[in-house]
Structure formats: structure tokens, C-alpha cells
């Protein structure tokens, strides 16, 4: 859902451009959504509930509309529910409940939502869209997006910084795909030729995800070798010190 703007407890290492965008976007959405978040708190709604409902909405938008070729309305529904990721983070901050659990839940459900979106594309191309190549590309986007996220999480779990974000992160994958899907859906309103945007976007996401995966694997390999060399040097130094 909304990684680039706000989430509960997740850290990021954006580029300067992304950091500037995040700064102004965060300030804007905080002003807009704070009253609504406060209203939900007064009604006894928890941040976790908002997270779960938001994910359910994204899944419904993707798997109900996209397989039928209703890309415009599906994207509208998904976009509306994506804002839940900003609301739950705002609520958590107001309640002083930012936690590891919230960060874990957000990240986990983000992966589920991503899978539903690209799964919806795959179902369309496997059915009414009748294009096996684009079905395969959609499945690749789904799988590669999950693996790209896993490489960073796994690298960090073994103590490596994984000091690279890569060419196409989750935010870029979603923006490219959803914007293209929304515009492609205008074909049903009589806009000719615009449906070609979605296949182009899927190819861009697929290639970008592959490049990002390679970037992260290479980075983890280099950092791992450096860490192993540093450990070996430290052990050798301690061994020589003990011998003397």
C-alpha cells in the first residue's frame, strides 16, 4: 500500500529526489488525513483494523475488476483503499503505538496487495485479454516484486546494510502499473488505442524489477564478502595477539 509516504515503523533510504517528494507529500497528507484518523480513533477503530480493511479493499478492487477488464474502476477502488496505509500510520502516531508489529503487519499485507494487483492482470490476460505472453509477464512482475522485497529483508536479517534501493522499488512498480491501468481503462469510454499503455507498463515493471533484483543480489554478495573478510581479519588479529 503506501510505502513512500507513511507507514508504521518502517525505515527507508530514499534518494534525494524521493526524500524531497516524501517530505512534502507527508506534510500534505498528514494535514488532510489527521482529522479523519482522529475521528476513527474516537470511534474505537484500531490502526490494525484500518490496515486489514485497506488490504481487503485493494484485493477486491484488483481481483473483482481487473480480471473483467474493468481497469479504470478497479484502479479507482484500489487508489481509494491505498490511502488506508497513510491513515493507519497517522492513527498509530496519534496513539503513540508505532511498533514492530505494525511495521511487520504493514509489510506483510503490502506483499499480499501487490500479489492481488498483478494477479488481477494475469487473470485478465489468461481470460478475456487472451494474451499468454502478457499473462506470463504479469506473473513475472508478481513474483519478481516479492523476491525483490525478500532480498533486502533477508540481507538485513543477516546483518548486512543492503545499501541499494535499485532501479524500480515497490512505489515505482505500483505507480507505473496503476497509472497505466487506469488510463488503459479509458478505452471502454471510447478513447482509442490507449489500452496499449498497460502492456508497455508491465514490460517496464518486469525489466525494472529484474534489474533491481540483480542490483540487490550483487550488493548483498559484495557486502557479504566484505563482512566475511573483516571477520577473518579480526579473528586473525585476535589469534596473533593471543599467541604473543
From Swiss-Prot:
The keyword tRNA processing does not apply. Its main location: membrane. A CDP-1,2-diacyl-sn-glycerol binds at residues 48-51, 89, 93, 99. Mg(2+) 2 binds at residues 85, 106, 110. One of its GO terms (cellular component) is plasma membrane. It comes from the Bacteria. This is Phosphatidylinositol phosphate synthase. InterPro entries: CDP-OH_P_trans (IPR000462), CDP-OH_PTrfase_TM_dom (IPR043130), CDP_ALCOHOL_P_TRANSF_CS (IPR048254), PIP_synthase_PgsA1 (IPR044268). Its EC number is 2.7.8.-. Gene3D superfamilies: 1.20.120.1760. The lineage of its organism: Bacteria, Bacillati, Actinomycetota, Actinomycetes, Kitasatosporales. NCBIfam families: PIPSynth (NF045883). One of its GO terms (molecular function) is magnesium ion binding.
Amino acid at each position: 500500500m503506501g510505502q513512500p509516504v507513511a507507514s508504521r515503523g518502517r525505515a527507508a533510504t530514499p534518494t534525494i529526489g524521493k526524500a524531497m517528494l516524501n517530505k512534502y507529500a507527508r506534510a500534505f497528507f498528514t494535514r488532510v488525513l489527521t482529522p479523519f484518523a482522529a475521528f476513527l480513533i474516537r470511534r474505537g477503530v484500531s490502526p490494525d483494523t484500518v490496515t486489514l480493511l485497506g488490504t481487503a479493499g485493494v484485493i477486491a478492487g484488483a481481483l473483482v475488476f481487473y480480471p473483467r477488464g474493468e481497469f479504470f474502476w478497479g484502479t479507482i477502488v484500489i487508489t481509494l483503499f491505498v490511502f488506508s496505509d497513510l491513515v493507519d500510520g497517522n492513527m498509530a502516531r496519534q496513539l503513540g503505538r508505532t511498533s514492530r508489529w505494525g511495521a511487520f503487519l504493514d509489510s506483510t499485507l503490502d506483499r499480499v496487495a501487490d500479489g492481488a494487483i498483478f494477479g488481477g492482470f494475469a487473470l485478465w490476460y489468461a481470460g478475456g485479454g487472451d494474451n499468454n505472453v502478457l499473462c506470463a509477464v504479469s506473473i513475472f512482475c508478481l513474483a519478481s516484486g516479492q523476491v525483490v522485497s525478500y532480498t533486502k529483508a533477508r540481507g538485513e536479517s543477516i546483518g548486512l546494510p543492503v545499501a541499494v534501493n535499485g532501479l524500480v522499488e515497490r512505489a515505482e512498480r505500483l505507480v507505473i502499473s496503476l497509472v497505466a491501468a487506469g488510463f488503459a481503462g479509458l478505452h471502454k469510454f471510447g478513447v482509442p488505442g490507449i489500452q496499449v499503455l498497460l502492456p508497455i507498463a508491465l514490460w517496464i515493471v518486469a525489466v525494472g524489477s529484474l534489474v533491481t533484483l540483480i542490483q540487490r543480489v550483487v550488493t548483498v554478495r559484495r557486502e557479504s564478502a566484505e563482512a566475511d573478510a573483516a571477520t577473518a581479519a579480526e579473528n586473525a588479529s585476535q589469534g596473533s595477539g593471543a599467541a604473543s
